[in-house]
Amino acid sequence: MTVADTAPGPATDRRGPRRVLVTLCITQITSWGVLYYAFPVLAGQISADTGWSVPILAAAFSAGLVVSALLGIVVGRWLDRHGPRWLMTLGSVVAVVAVLGLAGAPTIGWFAVAWVAAGTAMSAVLYPPAFAALTRWYGPRRVGALTILTLAGGLASTIFAPITAVLAGPLGWRGTYLVLAAVLAVVTVPGHLLGLNQKWPPAQHVTQERHRPDQVLRSRSFLALVAAFALAACASYAVVLNLVPLLHQKGVTYEVAAVALGLGGAGQVLGRLGYGWLSRSLRVRARTCLTLAGVAVTTALLAMFTGVAALITLAVLAGMVRGILTLVHATAVTDRWGASHYGQLTGVLSAPVTLAAAMAPWIGAVLAAVLGSYSTMFWVMAGMAAVAAALGLATVPAGCADSADVVTAQPAQ
């Protein structure tokens, strides 16, 4: 039997999902900006003020990401059944408390505990639950909605990094976190409470697929998908966070390297804008493998080339691939197994991916030190991404129609 996602039912006309999308765009910008992008801006000042080393601070931040990844599995299962409104509202409240905890932390231990609380909030307010909400409410129109959401999310660093830097001057890092906590409280708590007040469509109204989650989780195709995305996440995040030292080692000034990094962010926006065309033009397996191969190729070329213009161009191309990869990840479950258990399956899929992304900066730095150069480390990352692309061939289950919106209900393989 061939099954497809149907359009949202009568309980959720187009105005309802549109309001949800606008709400999530605003709250994602705010949540990412405060919970993720403010820390790199403030880390140096925190270290100088407290004497806590930057590596220790980074470890506390990474601990929050690990907690977010692990809790995402439980969050996804709950969201499938009950919807995102109360989950994301409570997550926003926890986020406010966590940021207040960061602002007032008297010791590094308390600072780490506050990041664990922030990680708990991240699991409930960042991309995975937002993706699940839009996938259920938008049905076959999900790709456009997800693209808009990730384009908005991409503005978080553009907006909040400079705001954080401006606030940190007169207010210090503690005062800055107090202001950011207030922003979270004013924007995200009422935003999720009021903006997500829509009837949650029952799973059977969204898809008629019969894949049991336990079958899918044990299937070869799902395990291959997890491995492929985790390897690609490790490679791509290692590239992002080690791009500046790579370029500097090749003779590029820090100022130009920073520009290249920023243009890579612009590349992500271009990649996301093009995903709708890609999803209509290529089947699931083809676009998965092509995107993962793109990570490998751009990483290898960054290791190979030395000219400034070529390196900047490659940084933009690598950013485009990362932008596409975000949406390939967001639609991976629905493209293969339908939308009924999207939250649970994506939660399990995202956990190792988030862990890999959290470890990537450390892995990249250690490899560069052991191997003696960032170029050699980039070659290793390119090889890792190539393995991910090869695994991509095995990520589509038997019986899947291998198209964007149609999934054939067969036992998971």
What would you call each of these model-derived segments?
Residues 70-108:
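Conserved MFS/SLC helix-loop-helix module at the cytosolic interface between two early adjacent transmembrane helices
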Residues 39-43, 220-273:
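Extracytoplasmic gate region of multi-pass secondary transporters
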Residues 264-268, 281-332:
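C-terminal transmembrane helical hairpin of 12-TM major facilitator-type secondary transporters
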Residues 46-47, 78-79, 162-171, 247-248, ...:
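Interfacial helix-cap and linker-helix signal at transmembrane-aqueous boundaries
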Residues 149-197:
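Helix-loop-helix hairpin linking two adjacent transmembrane segments in secondary transporters
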Residues 115-151, 332, 338:
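Cytoplasmic helix-loop-helix junction between adjacent transmembrane helices
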Residues 29, 98, 109-125, 230, ...:
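Hydrophobic core of transmembrane alpha-helices in multi-pass small-molecule transporters
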Residues 19-54, 72-75, 161, 239-244, ...:
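Extracytoplasmic
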